C-alpha cells in the first residue's frame, strides 16, 4: 500500500526550493545550471545560528586578520572537548593544529611522516581526490577494493597486508567511510592496527564524517584504540561536513604521540598559515555550541537516508542501495539497469540530475553513482522521479 506522504508533517528544510538554492554563490548548484545538484558533499540546510552569530561578531569586531595564537588555542580546546564528550577520546589541546582542510592534513601525513615517494594504500571506493592528489605530490597509490560481508562494506585486510608487504608505508583510513557510509568498528580497527604495526607502517585517519552518525551508533577514533595506533597515526578532521561550513577552509590535524608533535613544531607554522581566521571562529562555535542544530539535521537526514531507499526501489528497481550508517552520502549500484556508458553522465544529460561517477572513486566502482542526499526531500524526490523517467524513456530495465 502506498503511503500518502502529502498528509505527513513537513520540516522547515522542505521549504527550501530549487529557486532559492540555485544561486551563483553555490558551486554545487551553479556549475551545472538548471540541473539538480547532488554531487558536492555539502548540505542545502544553511548553517547553525550559533555559527552565524559567531561570524557576525567576528566581522563586527574586525576580526579578519591573520590567525592569532589565542584563536588557534581556543579551537584546540573546543576540538578536544568535543572528542572527549562525543567519543571518550582524551586529546591534548596543544596537539590540535589548524590547517586549511583534511587534504592538507593528508599531505602532511605522507610528506612529513612517511618516506619520500613511498606508496600509499587507498581502500576503494574512495573520496576522489585521494586518488589524484597523492600521485601529484609524488606518492603512488595502491588501490585496495573493499569487500562486502553481510551487506556491509569492509576493508580487505588480506590485500592491505599484501600492499604493505609490497612496499606501501601509509594507509588512508576513512571512517566513517565515504562513500559507503560504513562505520568501522573497534574489532576491524584492531585488525588493521595489527597489520600496520607488523609492517612498521603509518595511518592517516580521515574522520571528518564522524559527527554524522545515525541511531546513536558508537564511533571509535582510530588513534584512541591503543598506544600503538596513537604512535603511528595522524588524524584529520573538521567541522566542515557536519556543520556545513566547507568554504571557510579550516580543519584540524591531530598528532597523538610525542615524536609526531615535536616534528610538527618544525614545519607546522607554514601549514597552519593556510587555516582561515573565520573558519577557526566558525569551527570553535560549532564544537562548543552547534550540537542542537546538528542533532536536528541528523534527525532529518535519518529520514532522508530511508526515503532514498524508497525512491531507489520505486524509480530505479534493480539498482542496489544500502542505507548508510553515517554520512549524508548514498552509494548506488546501477549496473542492473543496463545504462550504456557512465551512469552519472546518463543521469546528468537525460534526467538533469548531477551525481558523481563511480569510476572516479576507484577501480571496480564502474556502474555506481554517488549521491549527496543532504537536500530538501521534495528535491530529492524530484531528482529520482526524473532519473526513473529517463531510464524508462531509454527503454532500459525498469
Q: Residue locations for each model-derived region?
A:
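N-terminal small-domain helix-loop-helix segment of the aminotransferase-like
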Residues: 2-101, 108, 288-289, 394-397
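Conserved core segment of the aminotransferase class I/II
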Residues: 55, 227-302, 391
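Conserved core of the PLP fold type I
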Residues: 64-194, 211-212, 217-228, 234, ...
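A non-catalytic, amphipathic alpha-helix used as a structural packing/dimerization or gating element
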Residues: 74, 78, 259, 263-266, ...
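PLP-dependent enzyme catalytic core of the Aspartate aminotransferase-like
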Residues: 81, 346-355, 361-398
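Conserved glycine-rich beta-strand-loop-beta hairpin in the small C-terminal domain of fold type I
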Residues: 284, 301-309, 321-334
Amino acid at each position: 500500500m502506498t503511503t500518502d506522504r502529502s498528509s505527513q508533517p513537513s520540516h522547515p528544510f522542505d521549504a527550501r526550493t530549487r529557486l532559492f538554492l540555485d544561486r551563483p554563490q553555490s558551486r554545487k548548484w551553479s556549475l551545472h545550471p538548471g540541473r539538480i545538484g547532488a554531487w558536492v558533499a555539502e548540505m542545502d540546510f544553511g548553517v547553525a545560528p550559533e555559527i552565524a552569530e559567531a561570524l557576525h561578531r567576528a566581522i563586527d569586531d574586525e576580526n579578519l586578520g591573520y590567525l592569532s595564537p589565542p584563536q588557534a588555542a581556543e579551537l584546540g580546546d573546543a576540538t578536544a572537548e568535543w572528542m572527549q564528550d562525543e567519543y571518550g577520546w582524551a586529546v591534548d589541546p596543544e596537539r590540535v593544529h589548524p590547517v586549511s582542510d583534511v587534504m592538507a592534513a593528508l599531505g602532511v601525513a605522507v610528506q612529513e611522516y612517511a618516506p619520500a615517494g613511498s606508496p600509499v594504500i587507498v581502500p576503494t571506493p574512495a573520496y576522489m581526490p585521494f586518488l589524484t592528489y597523492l600521485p601529484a605530490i609524488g606518492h603512488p597509490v595502491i588501490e585496495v577494493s573493499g569487500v562486502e560481508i553481510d551487506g556491509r562494506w569492509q576493508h580487505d585486510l588480506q590485500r592491505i597486508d599484501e600492499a604493505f608487504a609490497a612496499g606501501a608505508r601509509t594507509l588512508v583510513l576513512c571512517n566513517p567511510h565515504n562513500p559507503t557510509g560504513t562505520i568501522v568498528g573497534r574489532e576491524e580497527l584492531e585488525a588493521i592496527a595489527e597489520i600496520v604495526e607488523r609492517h612498521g607502517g603509518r595511518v592517516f585517519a580521515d574522520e571528518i564524517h564522524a559527527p554524522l552518525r545515525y541511531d546513536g551508533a558508537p564511533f571509535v577514533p582510530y588513534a584512541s584504540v591503543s598506544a600503538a595506533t596513537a604512535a603511528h597515526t595522524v588524524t584529520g578532521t573538521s567541522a566542515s561536513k557536519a556543520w556545513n561550513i566547507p568554504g571557510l577552509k579550516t580543519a584540524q590535524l591531530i598528532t597523538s604521540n610525542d615524536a609526531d608533535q615535536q616534528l610538527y613544531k618544525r614545519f607546522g607554522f607554514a601549514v597552519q598559515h593556510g587555516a582561515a581566521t573565520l573558519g577557526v571562529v566558525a569551527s570553535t562555535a560549532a564544537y562548543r555550541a552547534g550540537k542542537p542544530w546538528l542533532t536536528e539535521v541528523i534527525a532529518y537526514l535519518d529520514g532522508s537516508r530511508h526515503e532514498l531507499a524508497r525512491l531507489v526501489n520505486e524509480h530505479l528497481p534493480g539498482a542496489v542501495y544500502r542505507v548508510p550508517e553515517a554520512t549524508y552520502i548514498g552509494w548506488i549500484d546501477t549496473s542492473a539497469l543496463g545504462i550504456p556508458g557512465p551512469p552519472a553522465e546518463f543521469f546528468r544529460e537525460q534526467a538533469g540530475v548531477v551525481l558523481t561517477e563511480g569510476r572516479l572513486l576507484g577501480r571496480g566502482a564502474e556502474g555506481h553513482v554517488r549521491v549527496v542526499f543532504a537536500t530538501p526531500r521534495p528535491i530529492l524526490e524530484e531528482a529520482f522521479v526524473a532519473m526513473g523517467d529517463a531510464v524508462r524513456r531509454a527503454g532500459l530495465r525498469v
